[in-house]
Structures are given as C-alpha cells and as structure tokens.
Amino acid sequence: MRYIGSKKLLLPEIKKMVDKHTDGSEEVFLDLFAGTNVVANYFKQFYTVYSNDMLFFSYVNAKATIENNSKPSFSKLIQAGISSPMTYLQNLEVNDETIGYYEVAYSPTGEANYLSVHNAKKLDIIRSQIESWKNQNLLTEHEYYYLLSSLIEALPFISNTTGTYGAFLKHWDKRSLNDLELQDFTIFDNSKQNKAFNEDANELVQKIKADIVYIDTPYNSRQYASNYHLLENVARNEHPTLKGITKIFDWKNLKSDYATKGKALVAMRDLIQNINSTHIILSYNNEGIISEEDLTNILKEFSVDGIVDIKKIPYRKYQSKNVSKNKEIYELLFYIQRKPFSKNKTLNKPLNNVRVSSTKKYIKSPLNYIGGKYKLLNQILPLFPKNINTFVDIFSGGANVGINVKAKKYIFNDMNTRINEMFRYFQTQPPVKLVQQIEEKIDEWGLSKTNEDAFLAFRKHYNTNPNPLDLYVLSSFSYNYQFRFNNSMEFNNPFGRNRSHFSENMRNNLLNFVTKLQTLDATFTDNYFNEFDFSNLTSNDFIYLDPPYLITTGSYNDGKRGFSDWNNTSEMKLLNFMDYLNQHGIRFALSNVTEHKGKTNQLLKDWAYSRNLNVNYLDHNYNNSSHNSKSKGSQEVLITNYETKTFNLLNTK
C-alpha cells in the first residue's frame, strides 16, 4: 500500500541504528506510530513486537499480521461448507439492483469517483459478508481481522486517486477500472506474544514498557485521518454521514497534535518524557514542523547520558522518484538511551524459529521467468497424476509448477546453471535471513528503481564475481525482472527504470517459495533434456515438460533459455524423447501451443495424433508475461500419455 511517510526504504538504516546501540538482550520492540506496519513487520523477525496506531485500519492490519502468528485455518467456515473463504468472497456476485452504503459513498452512484460502481458494489457485499460471519461466530478474532485487512489492502489498487483520499480524480485512472482483488498476506510466526494497540501514543506509553521504542510521528500538517478516510471508514464500518465533495466523515477525534503547528513540540516532549524503555529511535525530516534543533534539545534532556546520536540520510536516496538535487532535504534518525543498562554486546540475529505462512492457494516463483505457468496452475495441476513418487520438471525454469505439485521427491532440471545455482543457494538459507541479506545488499549499493548508475555498477560487480545472491538482487532491478546473459554468460539485461525493484510482492513470493522449497526433498540438475538420466524412474514417477515453443517468438531469459536455438530439429529431439518415455511406461505431461498468431505446430499435432495421446485444451491465450507484450489467438494445450481421470497410461501407438 502506498502510504505517506512509509519507512520501507529506510529499514536498513533503522536496523543499523538499532544494532549500533543494543546488546542483543532486548526482547520487546514497540512501533508507536505503525501506519501500514512496515517497520513492525520487519522487526518481528528479531523481537516480540508491539504495534500501535490511532487509525483503526492500521490496527486491523496489525491484528492480522503482527499479533497473529499463523495462517488462518477458518475451521468453522470450512465446517459450514466454505472451503476457501478468500475465494468465496472474491466470487460473490454483485446485484445491480441493490445499492449499498459504500456504493453511495464512493462511486458515481453518489456523485463520487473514488471507486467504480462495480468495485463499490463488490466492496459493499464483501464487507457485509465478513461482518455477517463475525456476528455468526464463524470467525476467530484473527481470522476476522485477516479477511478485513485483505479487503482494505485491495482498495488502493483500484482507487481513482493519486495515492491518498484527499480527493478523487476527475477522469478515471486505468488501474481504477480493474476488478477488486483481495490481497493475501505473508505471516511471520516468531513464537512471541506480539500485541496490537489502537490508542493515542502519548497515553499508551504511560501504561506499557518496551526495550526499544520506535517513533515515526507525522512530520507536517497533512493529517493521516483525512488522507485515508475511505480506508478508515471501511475498517470501522459504522456508516457515518459523509460531508462535502470529498465524502469525508467527521474525523476531529482522530486529529493528530503532531501534524498541528503549535502543538507538535509540546506533544513530542510529553511523549519522550513518559516513555518507559531503554532505547528510543525517532524518525523525522529536516523540513518537519519541529525543528532539528528543538528535537535534539528534547531528546538530550531525557537521554540518560545527555547524548543524542543523529544520522542524516539524503531524502532522494529513499524516494521512488527523483527530487530536485538543489533541495537539501534529509531523513533524520535520532537515538537516545532512555534508561541505564549494562551493555554486553552480542550479535542480534533473526529468531531461529521464525516461520512463514500464507493463505495463497498456489506458491508463486520469486523469479519472473518467461513462459511461467503460474496463471495456468488451476487448470494444469488437476490433470496431473495423484500419488507421485518422483516428480521431474525437465524444463523447470522458475519452478512455478514443481513447487506446487505433491510428490515424495522432486527433481528440477534446467540448462540454465545460474538459475539452478540460485535455487540451490535458496535451499540453504533461512527465509527471513535471505530477505535480510537482499535488503542489506540493496542498501549497500544504493539500488532503487531510479538509480541507473548504481545498477550498472552493481551489474559490473556481479559479472566480475558472479554469485547467486547478487544475481537475484540484480534481476530485481532489471528490465521486466528477467535473467538475460550473453554468450560469455555475463548478465546483460538493462535497467528497469521506474518499475523494477524488490517490491513487497517479490519479498512475500520469495519468503513463501523458499519456505516451501525447504520442506521438499528436492534436487536441482543442469542437464540438456535428452541427456537426463531417467533409468531409475518407474510408472509411479511423473515427468512434466515445458519446453520453448516452436511457433512463438518469446525470447527466453538467457536469450534462448539455455539452448543455442529451438527449431524443428530441437522439436524432433523432444518428440523422440517423449516416445522413449512412453516406451518405458513413464507418465508425462507436455505444455505447449498448437496454434499461435496464425501459425500451427503441425509437427506436434501430427505426432500427438499418431501416438493416440490425450490433448487437453486449456482456456488461456498464450502470454509470455512481458510487461510490454501480449499475444492473442493462441491455443495452449497439455498433452498427456495417460487418462486424466484415472491417470492410467493410454494404449498409445
């Protein structure tokens, strides 16, 4: 979610400040002004975390992702016959004749353009259903907040605004015409009693204590309640009367003193004075309401040793878009020791028992691999045999398919050794630690979606000393997030300006993928497909093949996806290979296209027909997942040498 003052890009600096002054004995981390819980969620891997915010929609998110430690089971809903609540909510049908509160409030039905009429109707019916389940006692507390936060997180992606809700756009932005899609969360289980609060920060600090307190108050006169009133209204669901063109509720009780000149300094002094903690870290900005000098004086007054550690970070380093270089704008990080303690320094490491879970039906590869089958999984996987002993993905690529298959043993094979080296590295790293390594590398090199010089320097560094971690980081800032190499196996994909970066979605996909991967008995091999040794495979095993497509023009990640070229000769080798599998009674499934942009793969069609194979037609136009390229008029197929209902081998010719 785009959020004013989000500290996502500042996390490495905050972590450095914490590590500099703590000794590893600290247990509780309090985020007093949590917002979207970016900081709280990051530090959950190290500490028991308390999250607080005066806005209720922030509290909802904290209940779902901070206080909650596990993937919701939805056991009562399942008993009631609803196997997947997220899917159920997503598929609820809107009634054109029914006009709900949110439709009148935020759509053209009520003369507002925040949401399309369809999405506002969808919001009404989903919000109502979640509340109904709660009232029927079909949801636990955390299940309720999980579903509600999933809905709230979805709204910015289809809102007709510039990012906040101070006003809506006169003309409809393209993204606002997309359908509302509920957002899944990745949940960290740190086995701690984390807590979420929804209180005034100045009052809360007088009631609780923590070892580390992080403060990120508003800097300027923009009030968060008015800028995010739509999300707050949906979270509270009290249906208040709305006023004015902007359709805002009476938010006076949510007005922050920290965004009010004349009150901010007094409020800050009161806050610091009453905090019961050993360490205080404060984020601010040198153009904020409170001057740097005044902040320093307050902190010095309440520092146990009179010392204030100040770190100035150039503002443009942590922005997604460039700001004028003539502006001397800084993010400020202040640290004071509030109470005395005996420092016995130990390395602050992620908790060993942090676990990751998600409610997503399918795990998505952390790689954007051209030709990936993630969007086809719901059609492909039901056609795969059950009770697979060894699953072999012979053109594994980004491993979207294999990671979602149920089997006893897995072999992922691909010619691209660099990709396989990366996956082998992922197998050895704790998921949370892996993300931390990536974020530290990004910070070390100053990588961002606007800093091309840093990208080029890092690419040169990688090509001099290639390693799997750097390759993944490099791809995260590359054009279309892709992996491309020249004939010397040097990475040569250009910079992905203004788009490519290590996003929250990438982070969650990586965490979920690596967590799942490390539960599998999986091996990664680097063979050409017809050199793969399948002598130990039996009829209880299964081979999936997703080769380059003969009649499409997709340029694969390494130029030719590890192949010098894919032509009729390559296709014949593939068909002969599958004939050999067939003769040895090994079940296989082949993904391919028989038609594409007026072209026909007659070779493949004739081969499948002559062997009496099962051709399953999939409801999907071939799309190579490129941001700038969409193909039409394709027929995607899954060809199997077994019956897809009984999974028995066919009587092939």
From Swiss-Prot:
It comes from the Bacteria. GO terms for molecular function: S-adenosyl-L-methionine binding; sequence-specific DNA binding; site-specific DNA-methyltransferase (adenine-specific) activity. It comes from Streptococcus sanguinis. This is Modification methylase StsI. SUPFAM superfamilies: S-adenosyl-L-methionine-dependent methyltransferases (SSF53335). An alpha subtype methylase that recognizes the double-stranded sequence 5'-GGATG-3' in one strand and 3'-CATCC-5' in the other, methylates A of both strands, and protects the DNA from cleavage by the StsI endonuclease. The 2 domains of the protein participate in modification of the two strands. It catalyses: a 2'-deoxyadenosine in DNA + S-adenosyl-L-methionine = an N(6)-methyl-2'-deoxyadenosine in DNA + S-adenosyl-L-homocysteine + H(+). Keywords: DNA-binding, Methyltransferase, Repeat, Restriction system, S-adenosyl-L-methionine, Transferase. Monomer. InterPro entries: Ade-mod_methylase_MStsI (IPR012186), Ade_MeTrfase_dom_2 (IPR023095), DNA_methylase_N6_adenine_CS (IPR002052), MeTrfase_D12 (IPR012327), SAM-dependent_MTases_sf (IPR029063). The gene is stsIM. Belongs to the N(4)/N(6)-methyltransferase family. One of its GO terms (biological process) is mismatch repair. It is an enzyme of class 2 (transferase).
